[in-house]
From Swiss-Prot:
Protein's organism: Pseudomonas putida (strain W619)
InterPro entries assigned: Helicase_ATP-bd (IPR014001), Helicase_C-like (IPR001650), Helicase_RapA (IPR023949), P-loop_NTPase (IPR027417), RapA_C (IPR022737), SNF2-like_sf (IPR038718), SNF2/RAD54-like_C (IPR049730), SNF2_N (IPR000330)
Keyword line: Activator, ATP-binding, DNA-binding, Helicase, Hydrolase, Nucleotide-binding, Transcription, Transcription regulation
GO molecular function term, any single one: helicase activity
Annotated protein name in UniProt: RNA polymerase-associated protein RapA
Membrane-traversing stretches: none
Highest rank taxon of the organism: Bacteria
Chain span(s) of sequence motif DEAH box: 278-281
EC number: 3.6.4.-
Domain Helicase C-terminal, first and last residues per copy: 473-627
Binding site for ATP: 177-184
Described function: Transcription regulator that activates transcription by stimulating RNA polymerase (RNAP) recycling in case of stress conditions such as supercoiled DNA or high salt concentrations. Probably acts by releasing the RNAP, when it is trapped or immobilized on tightly supercoiled DNA. Does not activate transcription on linear DNA. Probably not involved in DNA repair.
Amino acid sequence: MAQQYQPGQRWISDSEAELGLGTILAQDGRLLTVLYPATGDTRQYSLRNAPLTRVRFSPGDQITHFEGWKLTVREVEDIDGLMVYHGLDGQNQPRTLPETQLSNFIQFRLASDRLFAGQIDPLSWFSLRYNTLQHTSKQVQSSLWGLGGCRAQPIAHQLHIAREVADRSAPRVLLADEVGLGKTIEAGLVIHRQLLTGRANRVLILVPENLQHQWLVEMRRRFNLQVALFDAERFIESDASNPFEDAQLALVALEWLVEDEKAQDALFAAGWDLMVVDEAHHLVWHEDKASTEYSLVEQLAQVIPGVLLLTATPEQLGQDSHFARLRLLDPNRFHDLAAFRAESEHYRPVAEAVQELLDEGRLSPKAHATIQGFLGAEGEALLAAVSDGDSQASARLIRELLDRHGTGRVLFRNTRAAIQGFPERELHPYPLPMPEQYRDLPAGEHAELYPEVAFQAQGEVSDDERWWRFDPRVDWLIDTLKMLKRTKVLVICAHAETAMDLEDALRVRSGIPASVFHEGMSILERDRAAAYFADEEFGAQVLICSEIGSEGRNFQFAHHLVMFDLPAHPDLLEQRIGRLDRIGQKHVIQLHIPYLQEGPQERLFQWYHEALNAFLNTCPTGNALQHQFGPRLLPMLEGGDSKAWDALVAEAKGERERLEAELHSGRDRLLELNSGGAGEGQALVEDILEQDDQFALPIYMETLFDAFGIDSEDHSENALILKPSEKMLDASFPLGDDEGVTITYDRGQALSREDMQFLTWEHPMVQGGMDLVLSGSMGNTAVALIKNKALKPGTVLLELLFVSEVVAPRSLQLGRYLPPAALRCLLDANGNDLASRVAFETLNEQLESVPRASANKFVQAQRDVLAKRISGGEAKIMPTHVERVAEAQRRLAAEADEELARLTALKAVNPSVRDSEIDALRKQREDGLAMLEKAALRLEAIRVLVAG
């Protein structure tokens, strides 16, 4: 044993192949010392069981000298235990290369190289590699890729918009859904799908400063997107020449950006594929002048290919403001406001005719004439079929009209009236007496709306004099919570100080378990607070949130909402109710509103309830009414004549009813149909729910965790705790937290427990783990004993896995046409391929592991035979590879040609189809076909099977 090792010999570590070639330094008693020059590491091993494999190359192998030149081996000589290789260099000159001068950086990654170098992996790893290939192949072809992994209930109109927009090259669209319909989720889905498919690599998100945190939370929690939040401090402190270039996704406040010219210059220079602008209706534009914010976004939109604008509904904004948004998307198409107004009027009668067809199932003579005038001679046959009662013809007619709709491809707008599934609301007001302590408070911003804040600001008071000792709203809250025991209650107040004080009050005065949630807490602390509230068995009954702290959070598992105070703007009121009032809420929303009489709180309640009707219904006119009546409203909240107050409320109510009637009459059902997807979105919902019910992912992940040394243990129903074990294989495994993480595969659980990771095929942990398997050599060699009575002992079968590989930009999405599915070959001694007769799973059940030393010994003895069979296997599988590539080219060409024909025909009737979109698709077709032509067959893995 001692003579097996000689100083200067080259060996490779079985457990740390990344160290490169090792050199024997010394053998001292029972210890062996090995230097790994590539990394500078030294290891000592026990002589008895050193995990090392001797590096021996054979004639035909190509090896590398430490100076970089290569040698093709012709002859191998053993001189005193050291290998000397003779052969030809790159200039075909005879040279000699002693093993002591081999490159230290040689790593055996190719399956055949590793097999013959004795680097044989556990049997389970080979199965893991095969299954990883199969799952990757299935996912990249899935129509749900980028849509199914969002931590949200799948909703038809959101999925339809996301797929329609994200599947375009450099989409430029306006998302103008009514409040509560999920514009942020739609934008997140578009971003996520574009990133996963490679259509976009760098995304810029511009938002108002007060929405930055909400976007950060939404992108991270729902989509696992790590967004870099930029502000003046981060920008100044960065050492990079351009701080934006380091961020794949940047979140920037527009208010800061317009004030900082250096940041603007850096932003323009960074290069982006997609820009998302939230609250785009605040960008002010008039025909003769534009605001600084509008001009900045306009300049960015001229250099960034893809643009998503999130905005209020067109009816809320008015036509001129709506035109200003469309002008940002396509200034060539929308260049003349007067022409746009005329075009909009042109479409209105058509939309009304469609409304009639939908409501009545038939067309009146007037509606018939309107549509005939719009479609011309092409539509006569279709209209005749509709008149005969053909329902399929009606559907085709609506599709034809949708295709011709002036803004149908650039504007998506859903309304609550068109979308089903929202809960009802019930209002419970509680007028309470004004405490004496609040009657003479010092003046301040909204001091009497939030008297507890003004009271506390007067200075330190004893514990017995704190505001929550005398404020009747606190007594009412304690009584209400006791009455609603075992029912989850969300309490929202305007200020973080109030939220923290209320937690103290409940703990001291009632012992009711409460969780608090405010902007002073870290995201992790908020997650824990939300999880404590969500826990049905041991969690808090009540969660007390501040206004800002609750932004972007979903608490729809609760249906009781207490507004401890009222916000100063109707949009904030709607945001509060929106924490619970979402599609999928199973209960009637119970709104509990305590307010202090004889002051601003009482009048603000009356304003929201009687003037705006904002408690029982969404208030799309709230912002416009606040803008119109705000200057008169604010002074009257503080006091004033009751008759004048009643008159103001009545006037505002009348104006609201007038605006709502305008909104209703202006509804464009044609646009709503296009935005809702006319059934296509529902099919996506059903596919996602079906995928959720499958067990393929949990089964696969358990094998992945086992292979990488990740321990999993039960946390609770549908939840697991993952922790790195002492035998963790790779520290780069994307666990997310070195201490451990809690996961669930259940969507419902993930929606109520935001502290848990929601694992889907799209999750970074899943994708990162799969990448670690396929990007390295893990599992690409194995040797096993096969127990089968039909096989004579000693019979050798060779199982080969090949992959058709195409190297191309991800944006071409060639994986959809040529996925990395394993091409499997199972060769017997005569070179016959048995793969079609023996399935992978069937074969797996008959296999047993072989000790590595025995496996290596067998492989070395059979090296020449196995090498010959591997070459024969490649020849066997090549025709299948050629056919797969040809089929991929046929599918790509057919899909691209169909879409090109559709867009070209559409452009003839709808000017919203951009030439650049058609040109990009045509180029993508050409590039994709050219790249597929270069697809190569690669040996992915080898398994040697010996009958026993």
